[in-house]
């Protein structure tokens, strides 16, 4: 193979590598890989958070919520924020002193009218609600247990509305992982 042919092959390989990187970048920008804040799903570093007083566990993306941001305001737990401060996760548990059901808890504690909710699911054992405002999405889920000290196990997520599609999988995974410690 002469030098020109070697140069041509090298140029083709470099061009293919550059095009491959461009395609990956374009694909990532389009949200096709569900990137959140520039991270691929495997780089979200999922961890389990435990509220030991009540045995509440939640899987959360520590790669996003990397900054401990104080104790939970509504019970025993922790707040986490993203490094850029645009997203917030609060995990907490509180005693169900009033003996509320998910429906009665919402009725007594919801700070906005039900018409302001974009999503609402209420069952005998949990509620999940979501609303939007000021460019943000607020999502909350609380599981009610009578066998774990009559506790309410909750999480609140706040994240940019413009990134909803990228956040959908994260919200689903975090929400479904909320539970009392089994054992």
Residue spans for each PLM region:
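Bacterial N-terminal signal peptides that target proteins for export
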Residues: 2-16
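N-terminal low-complexity, Pro/Thr/Ser-rich intrinsically disordered segments
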Residues: 29-49
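Short, hydrophobic/aromatic-rich segments at coil-to-beta transitions
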Residues: 42-48, 73-78, 121-129
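Surface-exposed amphipathic alpha-helical segments
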Residues: 64-65, 151-183
């Amino acid at each position: 193979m002469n030098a020109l042919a070697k140069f041509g092959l090298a140029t083709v390989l470099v061009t293919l590598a550059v095009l491959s990187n461009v395609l990956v970048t374009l694909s990532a920008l389009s949200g096709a890989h569900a990137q959140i804040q520039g991270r691929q799903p495997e780089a979200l570093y999922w961890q389990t958070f435990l509220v030991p007083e009540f045995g509440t566990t939640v899987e959360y993306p520590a790669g996003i919520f990397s900054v401990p941001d104080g104790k939970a305001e509504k019970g025993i737990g922790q707040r986490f924020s993203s490094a850029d401060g645009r997203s917030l996760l609060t995990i907490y548990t509180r005693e169900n002193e009033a003996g509320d059901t998910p429906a009665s808890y919402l009725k007594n504690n919801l700070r906005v009218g039900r018409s302001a909710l974009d999503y609402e699911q209420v069952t005998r054992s949990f509620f999940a609600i979501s609303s939007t405002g000021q460019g943000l999405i607020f999502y909350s889920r609380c599981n009610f247990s009578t066998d774990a000290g009559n506790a309410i196990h909750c999480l609140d997520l706040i994240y940019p509305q413009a990134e909803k599609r990228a956040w959908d999988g994260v919200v689903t995974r975090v929400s479904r992982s909320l539970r009392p410690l089994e054992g």
